[in-house]
Protein backbone atom coordinates (compact mmCIF):
# COMPACT_ATOMS: atom_id res chain seq x y z
CA UNK A 1 0.00 0.00 0.00
CA UNK A 2 1.16 3.50 -0.81
CA UNK A 3 0.86 6.16 1.89
CA UNK A 4 1.29 9.88 1.29
CA UNK A 5 1.34 12.37 4.13
CA UNK A 6 -0.08 15.84 3.46
CA UNK A 7 2.02 17.99 5.79
CA UNK A 8 -0.05 20.91 7.08
CA UNK A 9 1.00 21.10 10.72
CA UNK A 10 -1.88 20.21 13.02
CA UNK A 11 -4.12 19.68 9.95
CA UNK A 12 -1.84 17.03 8.40
CA UNK A 13 -3.41 13.80 7.20
CA UNK A 14 -2.58 10.54 5.42
CA UNK A 15 -3.67 9.37 1.98
CA UNK A 16 -3.83 5.59 1.69
CA UNK A 17 -3.67 4.13 -1.85
CA UNK A 18 -4.19 0.46 -2.67
CA UNK A 19 -6.61 -2.01 -4.21
CA UNK A 20 -9.37 -3.80 -2.27
CA UNK A 21 -8.95 -1.92 1.03
CA UNK A 22 -12.54 -0.70 1.36
CA UNK A 23 -13.36 -3.37 3.96
CA UNK A 24 -10.67 -1.95 6.26
CA UNK A 25 -12.19 1.50 6.71
CA UNK A 26 -13.48 0.64 10.20
CA UNK A 27 -10.02 -0.44 11.32
CA UNK A 28 -8.40 2.70 9.94
CA UNK A 29 -10.96 4.99 11.57
CA UNK A 30 -10.57 3.20 14.90
CA UNK A 31 -6.96 4.37 14.92
CA UNK A 32 -8.07 8.01 14.68
CA UNK A 33 -9.18 10.09 17.72
CA UNK A 34 -12.82 10.13 16.64
CA UNK A 35 -16.23 9.66 18.21
CA UNK A 36 -18.30 6.60 17.40
CA UNK A 37 -21.09 8.29 15.42
CA UNK A 38 -20.74 8.64 11.67
CA UNK A 39 -22.76 10.23 8.87
CA UNK A 40 -21.99 8.36 5.65
CA UNK A 41 -22.82 10.44 2.58
CA UNK A 42 -23.00 8.66 -0.77
CA UNK A 43 -25.02 8.84 -3.97
CA UNK A 44 -27.67 6.60 -5.45
CA UNK A 45 -25.26 5.03 -7.95
CA UNK A 46 -22.43 4.29 -5.53
CA UNK A 47 -24.61 3.22 -2.58
CA UNK A 48 -25.66 -0.23 -3.86
CA UNK A 49 -22.11 -0.97 -5.03
CA UNK A 50 -20.03 -0.09 -1.99
CA UNK A 51 -22.07 1.29 0.92
CA UNK A 52 -22.94 -2.12 2.45
CA UNK A 53 -19.26 -3.08 2.73
CA UNK A 54 -18.31 0.26 4.26
CA UNK A 55 -21.23 0.17 6.70
CA UNK A 56 -20.40 -3.39 7.79
CA UNK A 57 -16.74 -2.48 8.33
CA UNK A 58 -17.70 0.56 10.39
CA UNK A 59 -20.24 -1.32 12.50
CA UNK A 60 -17.79 -4.14 13.14
CA UNK A 61 -15.41 -1.50 14.50
CA UNK A 62 -18.08 -0.19 16.87
CA UNK A 63 -19.35 2.82 14.91
CA UNK A 64 -23.00 3.87 14.71
CA UNK A 65 -23.76 4.79 11.11
CA UNK A 66 -26.38 7.12 9.65
CA UNK A 67 -26.59 6.97 5.86
CA UNK A 68 -27.56 9.73 3.43
CA UNK A 69 -28.06 8.97 -0.26
CA UNK A 70 -28.16 11.92 -2.65
CA UNK A 71 -29.02 11.92 -6.36
CA UNK A 72 -25.89 11.37 -8.45
CA UNK A 73 -24.46 14.32 -10.35
CA UNK A 74 -23.55 17.99 -10.13
CA UNK A 75 -27.15 19.22 -9.54
CA UNK A 76 -26.91 17.78 -6.00
CA UNK A 77 -24.26 20.32 -4.96
CA UNK A 78 -26.79 22.74 -3.46
CA UNK A 79 -27.58 24.43 -0.17
CA UNK A 80 -30.87 22.51 -0.21
CA UNK A 81 -29.04 19.17 -0.17
CA UNK A 82 -26.69 20.47 2.51
CA UNK A 83 -29.68 21.45 4.65
CA UNK A 84 -31.08 17.94 4.30
CA UNK A 85 -27.79 16.51 5.54
CA UNK A 86 -27.78 18.90 8.51
CA UNK A 87 -31.26 17.64 9.42
CA UNK A 88 -30.07 14.04 9.27
CA UNK A 89 -27.06 14.86 11.44
CA UNK A 90 -29.31 16.48 14.05
CA UNK A 91 -31.80 13.59 13.88
CA UNK A 92 -29.01 11.15 14.74
CA UNK A 93 -27.55 13.40 17.45
CA UNK A 94 -24.16 13.82 15.82
CA UNK A 95 -21.87 15.95 17.97
CA UNK A 96 -18.53 17.66 17.36
CA UNK A 97 -16.63 14.39 17.81
CA UNK A 98 -18.77 12.65 15.18
CA UNK A 99 -17.50 12.22 11.62
CA UNK A 100 -18.81 12.82 8.13
CA UNK A 101 -17.61 10.28 5.55
CA UNK A 102 -17.84 10.94 1.81
CA UNK A 103 -18.19 7.75 -0.25
CA UNK A 104 -18.36 8.68 -3.92
CA UNK A 105 -17.04 11.07 -6.51
CA UNK A 106 -16.26 14.76 -6.47
CA UNK A 107 -19.85 15.88 -5.98
CA UNK A 108 -20.30 13.71 -2.89
CA UNK A 109 -16.93 14.83 -1.53
CA UNK A 110 -17.59 18.52 -2.10
CA UNK A 111 -21.06 18.40 -0.54
CA UNK A 112 -20.17 16.16 2.40
CA UNK A 113 -17.05 18.21 3.06
CA UNK A 114 -19.05 21.44 3.03
CA UNK A 115 -21.46 19.95 5.57
CA UNK A 116 -18.56 18.72 7.73
CA UNK A 117 -16.93 22.16 7.61
CA UNK A 118 -20.09 23.98 8.69
CA UNK A 119 -22.00 21.59 10.98
CA UNK A 120 -21.33 22.75 14.55
CA UNK A 121 -18.48 24.87 13.09
CA UNK A 122 -16.63 21.80 11.90
CA UNK A 123 -16.56 18.05 12.52
CA UNK A 124 -14.02 15.45 11.33
CA UNK A 125 -14.25 14.59 7.64
CA UNK A 126 -13.07 11.44 5.84
CA UNK A 127 -12.81 11.00 2.07
CA UNK A 128 -13.35 7.65 0.32
CA UNK A 129 -13.28 8.68 -3.36
CA UNK A 130 -14.68 6.18 -5.87
CA UNK A 131 -14.09 8.01 -9.18
CA UNK A 132 -10.78 8.66 -10.91
CA UNK A 133 -11.30 12.41 -10.79
CA UNK A 134 -11.92 12.36 -7.05
CA UNK A 135 -9.03 9.97 -6.37
CA UNK A 136 -6.44 12.05 -8.20
CA UNK A 137 -7.72 15.53 -7.43
CA UNK A 138 -10.81 16.65 -5.54
CA UNK A 139 -10.46 14.41 -2.46
CA UNK A 140 -7.10 15.96 -1.58
CA UNK A 141 -6.49 19.57 -0.60
CA UNK A 142 -9.52 20.59 1.42
CA UNK A 143 -11.63 22.51 -1.08
CA UNK A 144 -15.30 21.91 -0.24
CA UNK A 145 -18.27 23.74 -1.72
CA UNK A 146 -21.74 23.84 -3.17
CA UNK A 147 -22.83 25.60 -6.34
CA UNK A 148 -24.92 28.73 -6.73
CA UNK A 149 -26.94 29.96 -9.68
CA UNK A 150 -24.24 32.62 -10.16
CA UNK A 151 -21.39 30.14 -10.45
CA UNK A 152 -19.75 26.83 -9.61
CA UNK A 153 -18.35 26.30 -6.09
CA UNK A 154 -19.22 29.85 -5.08
CA UNK A 155 -20.24 28.89 -1.53
CA UNK A 156 -17.54 26.91 0.21
CA UNK A 157 -14.53 26.65 2.47
CA UNK A 158 -11.03 25.28 2.83
CA UNK A 159 -11.46 22.30 5.16
CA UNK A 160 -8.95 19.48 5.22
CA UNK A 161 -10.05 15.86 5.66
CA UNK A 162 -8.82 13.73 8.54
CA UNK A 163 -7.93 10.94 6.14
CA UNK A 164 -8.25 9.94 2.48
CA UNK A 165 -8.66 6.27 1.55
CA UNK A 166 -8.23 5.53 -2.16
CA UNK A 167 -9.29 2.05 -3.24
CA UNK A 168 -8.58 1.82 -6.97
CA UNK A 169 -10.71 -1.34 -7.18
CA UNK A 170 -13.77 0.93 -7.06
CA UNK A 171 -12.84 2.15 -10.55
CA UNK A 172 -13.81 -1.26 -11.95
CA UNK A 173 -17.47 -0.21 -11.78
CA UNK A 174 -16.93 3.36 -12.98
CA UNK A 175 -18.72 4.19 -16.26
CA UNK A 176 -16.28 4.71 -19.13
CA UNK A 177 -17.35 8.32 -19.59
CA UNK A 178 -16.52 9.06 -15.93
CA UNK A 179 -13.15 7.34 -16.27
CA UNK A 180 -12.24 9.47 -19.28
CA UNK A 181 -13.39 12.61 -17.47
CA UNK A 182 -11.06 11.77 -14.60
CA UNK A 183 -8.17 11.48 -17.03
CA UNK A 184 -8.53 15.20 -17.76
CA UNK A 185 -7.30 16.02 -14.26
CA UNK A 186 -4.55 13.40 -14.59
CA UNK A 187 -3.32 15.03 -17.81
CA UNK A 188 -3.46 18.40 -16.06
CA UNK A 189 -0.78 17.31 -13.60
CA UNK A 190 1.54 16.37 -16.44
CA UNK A 191 1.12 19.79 -18.03
CA UNK A 192 1.45 21.91 -14.88
CA UNK A 193 4.11 19.99 -12.95
CA UNK A 194 5.79 16.94 -14.45
CA UNK A 195 6.66 16.64 -18.13
CA UNK A 196 8.02 13.11 -17.66
CA UNK A 197 4.64 12.06 -16.24
CA UNK A 198 2.97 13.55 -19.32
CA UNK A 199 5.27 11.43 -21.50
CA UNK A 200 4.40 8.36 -19.41
CA UNK A 201 0.69 9.09 -19.96
CA UNK A 202 1.21 9.31 -23.72
CA UNK A 203 2.57 5.76 -23.61
CA UNK A 204 0.29 4.29 -20.94
CA UNK A 205 -3.13 5.97 -21.13
CA UNK A 206 -4.61 2.78 -22.63
CA UNK A 207 -3.59 0.86 -19.49
CA UNK A 208 -5.61 3.31 -17.43
CA UNK A 209 -8.62 2.99 -19.73
CA UNK A 210 -8.26 -0.79 -19.45
CA UNK A 211 -8.27 -0.49 -15.63
CA UNK A 212 -4.82 -1.98 -15.09
CA UNK A 213 -4.47 -2.00 -11.29
CA UNK A 214 -0.75 -1.21 -11.25
CA UNK A 215 -1.23 1.73 -13.61
CA UNK A 216 -4.19 3.04 -11.59
CA UNK A 217 -2.21 2.91 -8.34
CA UNK A 218 0.74 4.64 -10.00
CA UNK A 219 -1.49 7.40 -11.38
CA UNK A 220 -3.21 7.97 -8.03
CA UNK A 221 0.10 8.07 -6.18
CA UNK A 222 1.79 10.42 -8.67
CA UNK A 223 -1.14 12.84 -8.81
CA UNK A 224 -1.68 12.87 -5.04
CA UNK A 225 2.02 13.54 -4.44
CA UNK A 226 1.89 16.51 -6.79
CA UNK A 227 -1.34 17.81 -5.26
CA UNK A 228 0.08 17.40 -1.74
CA UNK A 229 3.26 19.29 -2.68
CA UNK A 230 1.26 22.21 -4.07
CA UNK A 231 -1.19 22.34 -1.16
CA UNK A 232 1.62 22.20 1.40
CA UNK A 233 3.12 25.32 -0.18
CA UNK A 234 -0.15 27.22 -0.56
CA UNK A 235 -3.11 25.74 1.29
CA UNK A 236 -5.56 28.59 0.70
CA UNK A 237 -4.73 29.42 -2.91
CA UNK A 238 -2.98 32.73 -2.32
CA UNK A 239 -0.17 31.89 -4.73
CA UNK A 240 1.12 28.77 -6.48
CA UNK A 241 -1.94 26.60 -5.76
CA UNK A 242 -3.71 28.53 -8.51
CA UNK A 243 -1.75 26.46 -11.06
CA UNK A 244 -4.15 23.62 -10.23
CA UNK A 245 -6.82 25.71 -11.97
CA UNK A 246 -5.29 25.06 -15.39
CA UNK A 247 -8.23 24.52 -17.73
CA UNK A 248 -10.76 25.54 -15.10
CA UNK A 249 -11.33 29.18 -16.11
CA UNK A 250 -13.01 28.22 -19.37
CA UNK A 251 -14.11 24.86 -17.96
CA UNK A 252 -16.21 26.33 -15.16
CA UNK A 253 -17.84 28.75 -17.61
CA UNK A 254 -18.81 25.84 -19.88
CA UNK A 255 -20.31 23.94 -16.95
CA UNK A 256 -22.27 26.94 -15.74
CA UNK A 257 -23.61 28.02 -19.14
CA UNK A 258 -24.48 24.49 -20.25
CA UNK A 259 -26.33 23.69 -17.06
CA UNK A 260 -24.61 21.63 -14.37
CA UNK A 261 -24.58 17.99 -15.42
CA UNK A 262 -24.62 18.54 -19.20
CA UNK A 263 -20.86 18.08 -19.26
CA UNK A 264 -18.90 16.20 -16.65
CA UNK A 265 -16.37 18.36 -14.82
CA UNK A 266 -13.43 16.62 -16.50
CA UNK A 267 -14.96 17.07 -19.94
CA UNK A 268 -15.31 20.81 -19.38
CA UNK A 269 -11.77 21.01 -18.00
CA UNK A 270 -10.45 19.18 -21.08
CA UNK A 271 -11.98 21.84 -23.34
CA UNK A 272 -10.61 24.51 -21.02
CA UNK A 273 -7.09 23.04 -21.11
CA UNK A 274 -7.03 23.09 -24.89
CA UNK A 275 -8.35 26.67 -24.94
CA UNK A 276 -5.65 27.77 -22.48
CA UNK A 277 -2.95 25.92 -24.45
CA UNK A 278 -4.14 27.55 -27.67
CA UNK A 279 -4.05 30.96 -25.97
CA UNK A 280 -0.48 30.24 -24.85
CA UNK A 281 0.40 29.20 -28.41
CA UNK A 282 -1.08 32.39 -29.86
CA UNK A 283 0.82 34.49 -27.32
CA UNK A 284 4.11 32.84 -28.24
CA UNK A 285 4.43 31.25 -24.81
CA UNK A 286 3.97 27.61 -25.84
CA UNK A 287 5.58 25.80 -28.77
CA UNK A 288 3.51 24.33 -31.58
CA UNK A 289 4.94 20.90 -30.74
CA UNK A 290 3.86 21.01 -27.09
CA UNK A 291 0.43 22.34 -28.04
CA UNK A 292 -0.06 19.44 -30.42
CA UNK A 293 1.02 16.93 -27.76
CA UNK A 294 -1.53 18.32 -25.31
CA UNK A 295 -4.24 18.29 -27.98
CA UNK A 296 -3.39 14.76 -29.14
CA UNK A 297 -3.40 13.22 -25.67
CA UNK A 298 -6.71 14.81 -24.69
CA UNK A 299 -8.19 13.62 -27.97
CA UNK A 300 -6.67 10.14 -27.67
CA UNK A 301 -8.30 9.40 -24.33
CA UNK A 302 -11.69 10.31 -25.78
CA UNK A 303 -12.28 13.73 -24.26
CA UNK A 304 -13.92 16.64 -26.12
CA UNK A 305 -11.48 18.97 -27.85
CA UNK A 306 -13.85 21.55 -29.34
CA UNK A 307 -16.07 24.02 -27.50
CA UNK A 308 -19.83 23.35 -27.48
CA UNK A 309 -21.44 24.82 -30.58
CA UNK A 310 -24.36 26.24 -28.66
CA UNK A 311 -22.20 28.50 -26.50
CA UNK A 312 -21.14 31.86 -27.87
CA UNK A 313 -17.55 33.00 -27.22
CA UNK A 314 -18.73 36.26 -25.64
CA UNK A 315 -21.12 34.36 -23.36
CA UNK A 316 -18.21 32.24 -22.15
CA UNK A 317 -16.14 35.35 -21.45
CA UNK A 318 -19.01 37.05 -19.61
CA UNK A 319 -19.41 33.95 -17.44
CA UNK A 320 -15.68 33.92 -16.66
CA UNK A 321 -15.94 37.40 -15.15
CA UNK A 322 -18.24 35.92 -12.48
CA UNK A 323 -15.69 33.24 -11.60
CA UNK A 324 -14.10 33.52 -8.15
CA UNK A 325 -10.65 33.28 -9.76
CA UNK A 326 -10.94 36.77 -11.25
CA UNK A 327 -8.75 39.41 -9.59
CA UNK A 328 -9.95 43.03 -9.45
CA UNK A 329 -12.17 42.42 -12.45
CA UNK A 330 -9.33 40.92 -14.49
CA UNK A 331 -9.44 37.46 -16.06
CA UNK A 332 -6.82 35.09 -14.66
CA UNK A 333 -5.45 32.25 -16.77
CA UNK A 334 -2.99 29.46 -16.07
CA UNK A 335 -1.00 29.08 -19.30
CA UNK A 336 1.55 26.39 -20.14
CA UNK A 337 5.07 27.41 -21.18
CA UNK A 338 6.14 23.81 -21.74
CA UNK A 339 5.09 20.37 -20.56
CA UNK A 340 5.63 20.50 -16.82
CA UNK A 341 5.74 24.28 -16.49
CA UNK A 342 2.94 26.84 -16.30
CA UNK A 343 2.60 30.44 -15.19
CA UNK A 344 -0.31 32.47 -13.85
CA UNK A 345 -1.33 35.43 -16.00
CA UNK A 346 -3.51 37.97 -14.18
CA UNK A 347 -4.41 40.41 -16.92
CA UNK A 348 -5.19 38.53 -20.11
CA UNK A 349 -6.74 40.70 -22.79
CA UNK A 350 -10.34 39.90 -23.58
CA UNK A 351 -9.69 40.24 -27.32
CA UNK A 352 -7.02 37.53 -27.15
CA UNK A 353 -9.39 35.17 -25.34
CA UNK A 354 -12.17 35.94 -27.79
CA UNK A 355 -9.87 35.05 -30.68
CA UNK A 356 -9.13 31.65 -29.13
CA UNK A 357 -12.76 30.89 -28.32
CA UNK A 358 -13.76 31.82 -31.86
CA UNK A 359 -11.29 29.41 -33.52
From Swiss-Prot:
Stretch forming the signal peptide: none
Xref: InterPro entries: Dehydroquinate_synthase, DHQ_synth_AroB, DHQ_synth_fam, DHQS/DOIS_N, DHQS_C
Pfam families: DHQ_synthase, DHQS_C
Main location: cytoplasm
Family membership noted in the UniProt record: Belongs to the sugar phosphate cyclases superfamily. Dehydroquinate synthase family.
NCBIfam families tied to this protein: aroB
Full protein name: 3-dehydroquinate synthase
Gene this chain is encoded by: aroB
Amino acid sequence: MGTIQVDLGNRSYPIYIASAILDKIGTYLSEQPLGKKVLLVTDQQVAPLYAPRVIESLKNAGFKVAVAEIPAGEPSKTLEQASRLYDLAFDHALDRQSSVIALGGGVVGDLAGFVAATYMRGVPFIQIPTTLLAQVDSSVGGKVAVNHSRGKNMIGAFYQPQMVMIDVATLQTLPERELKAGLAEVIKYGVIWDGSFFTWLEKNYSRILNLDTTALEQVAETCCKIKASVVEQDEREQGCRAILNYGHTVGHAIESLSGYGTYLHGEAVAMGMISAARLALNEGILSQQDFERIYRLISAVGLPTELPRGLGPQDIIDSMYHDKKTVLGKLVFVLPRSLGQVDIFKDVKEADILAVLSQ
